[in-house]
Each structure stands twice: as C-alpha cells, then as structure tokens.
Amino acid sequence: MIWAWLTLSSGLLNALWSSQIKSRVQKEGALTFTISMRWGVALSLLPFALFALKVLSAKWWFLSTLSGSLECLSLWALTRGARHDYYSTYALSNVTPIFSACWALAFLGETLSPTLGLGVVLVVAGALWLYYRGHWSWWGLLGAIFGSLSGLFSKMALPESGFLLHSCFAFMVGAFLLTVGGLKGRTTTVPAIARNVWANRILIVLSALSTVVFYAALQMAPLSRVSTLVRVNLVFGFLLSYFHLGEKHGWKARGFGAILLLAGLVLVLWKP
C-alpha cells in the first residue's frame, strides 16, 4: 500500500500549495502564475532527472510528449473556463476519475470492481457537490478529458523511464508550450515569468514534491485507483479553506460533499 500513502501525500501537498492560488493569480495573472509554476517544477526536478538519464525509445519520447502536451491543453481549458465560471469549471474538471477509469479499462487492461466503481462515482459526486454552482462548463469537461488522457499516456511511459525522468520532461513540455502561447498572445513576458519563479519558490517546492510522489504512485498502482485517490486534495482543500482561510459560508453543504468524497476514497482503497 505504499502507492496509497504516496497518493495521499501528493493530495495533501497539492492542497497546501493550491490553497494560495487565488491571491497569487489576482496579483500575477493566471497564465503567468501557471507558467512560472510549471517552469519552477521542471527546473527543480531537472538535476534528478539528469542523474537518472538513460537511452529511451522513440515510443517513450512520443508518449511523454503527448502527456505533457495534453496536460498543457487541460490547463489552458481550465484557464479559459475560469474566466466565465470558476466554480463550475473546477467542479467539472474533477470528473477526471471517470474518464481515467474508462481509459484504464480500454487500453491498460485494468479491472473495475463494483467497489472501485462505486468509489469513483462517490468521489466525483463529492467533488461536484463541493464546487458545482449549477452552470455547465464545457471548458471544465474538456480539462477533465485532456487531464485523464495525459494520465493514460504517463502510465504507459513510466515503466520505461521511472517517475523522475518522465515528470520532469512532461512538465518541461507543458511549460514550453504555455510560454510560447503566452508570448505569442502577449499575455505574459519572459521577465515576468522569471520574476514569479523566484517569488513562488516555496509553492514550487511543494508542487514539485507533490508531482514526484504522484508519479511514483502512478508507476506502482493502477491508473483508475491513483487518479481517484489523489482527489483527497479536495478534502484537504476544504479543511484548509475552513480553518486556515476562514471561508465558512455554506460549510455544512460543502461538508456533505467532503463526506461523499471520503466515503468514495475508502472504497477506492478497499481490497476485496
């Protein structure tokens, strides 16, 4: 069950750094913040990735490039959707486990027991209950689809390289594509990105740790389980918003969503 502890740790670390997103985005802008975080994580992992560097097949480079590109598309979709309706976009982006389970069944030969299937449904229901505000967001759904496909290709690439090489390269691909798009659209600048990499150094360390342990877990365990269990970050995020940020409006209704999530996570961990 090492993979489970790694996934839970990734969820906690993710919640810790992402709880600071709102204030940072308001100050720096969504795209500049996102790009600086991606470059920061990629560069912080680079020394370890170089140490683990070895000859890799063309298939690995193709799969890892696809993974990084699709993750970039997922972030782009979420950024677009958040401009119109942040909560609905974020809520629908968390239906990712459903798509991940479908890809795992179709392409990885994983099995989906009734217990695991119910766990996936409860986790997604809890995420929607926590954040959905009654408006449909195609951007959120697209973000979920792209994110789940990124996870699929990562799962395919990890056995050959290990988690350090793959995570570093995939993040670098995403950072490069986002930077090119941002510079072309004149929505960010290189000095702004560089300045924010340093300003966000603590968040980058937390995000890098979260990334490493997530991919380590994904290398060990089925995609359908890891993709669902990592949603524990939503529970940690709810607790941080209540106790640390003092966001107590509607906490009882949101708390029910957290309970659904926890029930689903227990089922995901359940081994018949």
Where are the model-predicted features located?
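Specific alpha-helical transmembrane segments that line the substrate/conduction pathway
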Residues: 70, 79-121, 167-172, 223-243
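Hydrophobic alpha-helical transmembrane segments in multi-pass integral membrane proteins
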Residues: 45-53, 100-115, 148-166, 207-223, ...
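Conserved small-residue-rich
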Residues: 140-184
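Membrane-interface interhelical linkers
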Residues: 1-69, 73-84, 128-141, 172-220, ...
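Juxtamembrane helix-start motifs in multi-pass secondary transporters
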Residues: 30-34, 163-167, 226
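Structural signature of transmembrane alpha-helices in multi-pass secondary transporters
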Residues: 10, 41, 93-96, 143, ...
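Hydrophobic transmembrane alpha-helices of multi-pass small-molecule transport proteins
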Residues: 40, 45, 99-105, 114-130, ...
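C-terminal appended segment following the main domain
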Residues: 218-272
